[in-house]
């Protein structure tokens, strides 16, 4: 089983997931990951949800999940029962730039939360209709519908990632702006300019 966070990285850039897999012994969290851990607390996330209008009926935090279907496991930040929306998977991130960013360039974050939702459904038999992406820095909550197309996209992505990594295939590079700040740029594309902070 691979970590759900690897699916998020694969959606962002397949090579990031590949390097996480092959360089696993030397893999270290990035600075934004460490900063996110420092400011994350259940009370903070709960407060953001409530200030966003959530009526939390029941809650569970740091929920271990696994999905045989997806070949993934991990720990969801939270699962809450909300008064009108039902069961929601909560994923906290250091920063979410905007709703538009989340649904375009930040879609990898949605895929991570949706993978946790599918694992929750498989493990516990619940039905999850919504995801809540919580932005810690600006105290905002973004609600995402677990649509049939999102479910299909996550299953397809997990299948594609697992096949690629099981076969040991290095995905082709996709040079772009995100490469400048990637923690694997020195291994993947050593010719990329050495500027920007690591992702």
Curated annotation (Swiss-Prot):
<dbReference type="GO" id="GO:0045145">
    <property type="term" value="F:single-stranded DNA 5'-3' DNA exonuclease activity"/>
</dbReference>
<dbReference type="InterPro" id="IPR013343">
    <property type="entry name" value="CRISPR-assoc_prot_Cas4"/>
</dbReference>
<keyword id="KW-0378">Hydrolase</keyword>
<protein>
    <recommendedName>
        <fullName>CRISPR-associated exonuclease Cas4</fullName>
        <ecNumber>3.1.12.1</ecNumber>
    </recommendedName>
</protein>
<keyword id="KW-0411">Iron-sulfur</keyword>
<keyword id="KW-0464">Manganese</keyword>
<feature type="binding site">
    <location>
        <position position="13"/>
    </location>
    <ligand>
        <name>[4Fe-4S] cluster</name>
    </ligand>
</feature>
<keyword id="KW-0269">Exonuclease</keyword>
<keyword id="KW-0479">Metal-binding</keyword>
<feature type="binding site">
    <location>
        <position position="91"/>
    </location>
    <ligand>
        <name>Mn(2+)</name>
    </ligand>
</feature>
<dbReference type="GO" id="GO:0051539">
    <property type="term" value="F:4 iron, 4 sulfur cluster binding"/>
</dbReference>
<keyword id="KW-0540">Nuclease</keyword>
<dbReference type="InterPro" id="IPR011604">
    <property type="entry name" value="PDDEXK-like_dom_sf"/>
</dbReference>
<keyword id="KW-0408">Iron</keyword>
<feature type="binding site">
    <location>
        <position position="77"/>
    </location>
    <ligand>
        <name>Mn(2+)</name>
    </ligand>
</feature>
<dbReference type="Pfam" id="PF12705">
    <property type="entry name" value="PDDEXK_1"/>
</dbReference>
<comment type="function">
    <text>CRISPR (clustered regularly interspaced short palindromic repeat) is an adaptive immune system that provides protection against mobile genetic elements (viruses, transposable elements and conjugative plasmids). CRISPR clusters contain sequences complementary to antecedent mobile elements and target invading nucleic acids. CRISPR clusters are transcribed and processed into CRISPR RNA (crRNA). This may be a 5' to 3' ssDNA exonuclease.</text>
</comment>
<dbReference type="InterPro" id="IPR038726">
    <property type="entry name" value="PDDEXK_AddAB-type"/>
</dbReference>
<feature type="binding site">
    <location>
        <position position="179"/>
    </location>
    <ligand>
        <name>[4Fe-4S] cluster</name>
    </ligand>
</feature>
<keyword id="KW-0051">Antiviral defense</keyword>
<comment type="similarity">
    <text>Belongs to the CRISPR-associated exonuclease Cas4 family.</text>
</comment>
<feature type="binding site">
    <location>
        <position position="92"/>
    </location>
    <ligand>
        <name>Mn(2+)</name>
    </ligand>
</feature>
<dbReference type="GO" id="GO:0030145">
    <property type="term" value="F:manganese ion binding"/>
</dbReference>
<dbReference type="GO" id="GO:0006308">
    <property type="term" value="P:DNA catabolic process"/>
</dbReference>
<dbReference type="InterPro" id="IPR051827">
    <property type="entry name" value="Cas4_exonuclease"/>
</dbReference>
<feature type="binding site">
    <location>
        <position position="182"/>
    </location>
    <ligand>
        <name>[4Fe-4S] cluster</name>
    </ligand>
</feature>
<keyword id="KW-0004">4Fe-4S</keyword>
<dbReference type="GO" id="GO:0051607">
    <property type="term" value="P:defense response to virus"/>
</dbReference>
<feature type="binding site">
    <location>
        <position position="188"/>
    </location>
    <ligand>
        <name>[4Fe-4S] cluster</name>
    </ligand>
</feature>
